């Protein structure tokens, strides 16, 4: 299912009051964006790696963000990463939706109870993570295009010095 359709269904579920179902959709979207952000620049400068664990992906994204010299992006990533770590932590964190309980079917009533406010916080987390992933992917595409056209530019400048 395309990401925008999954997002629309998540919003529709929240509007209809089906918060737990909406949150399940949002967890899939969060994982997708986290993987997309971690895969930026893979195979361009260094050998392509596969990041299976969330902590490995977070460390890769952290490394990318810190290399960009963009204060806003560093601040945004720091806040998003801290909240995302709470959401996906092994042990439940007070006041944060516990992903593992909902996704893996832990039917402890307290852990799977989702309210509108918590679902809205998860949407905002996804939107910000999407913004970061798109930013990294756009930068990657610019670098990829630059590397594609660089040899012809060098030859042109060599043949036509100004």
Where do the protein language model's features map onto the residues?
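Short non-catalytic regulatory patches outside canonical folded cores
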Residues: 24-83
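Acidic, Ser/Thr-rich low-complexity intrinsically disordered segments
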Residues: 151-162
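Short, flexible/disordered secondary-structure transition segments
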Residues: 21, 40-41, 109-113
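Charged alpha-helical initiation segments
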Residues: 1-20
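Amphipathic, non-membrane alpha-helical segments in soluble helical-bundle scaffolds
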Residues: 19-23, 89-92
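Charge-enriched, short contiguous segments at helix-coil
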Residues: 81-151
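Short, flexible loop/turn elements at secondary-structure junctions
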Residues: 14, 18, 27, 31-34, ...
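Residue-level detector of well-ordered alpha-helical segments, enriched
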Residues: 21-26, 98
């Amino acid at each position: 299912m395309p990401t925008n359709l999954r997002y629309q269904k998540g919003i529709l579920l929240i509007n209809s009051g089906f918060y737990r179902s909406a949150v399940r959709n949002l967890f899939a979207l969060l994982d997708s964006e986290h993987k997309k952000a971690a895969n930026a620049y893979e195979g361009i400068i260094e050998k392509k790696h596969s990041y299976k664990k969330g902590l490995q992906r977070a460390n890769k994204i952290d490394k990318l963000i810190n290399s960009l010299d963009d204060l806003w992006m560093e601040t945004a990533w720091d806040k998003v990463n801290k909240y995302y770590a709470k959401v996906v932590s092994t042990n439940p964190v007070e006041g944060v939706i516990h992903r593992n309980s909902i996704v893996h079917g832990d039917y402890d009533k307290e852990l799977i109870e989702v309210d509108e406010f918590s679902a809205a916080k998860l949407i905002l987390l996804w939107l910000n993570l999407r913004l970061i992933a798109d930013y990294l992917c756009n930068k990657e595409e610019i670098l990829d295009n630059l590397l594609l056209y660089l040899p012809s530019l060098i030859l042109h400048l060599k043949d036509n010095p100004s």
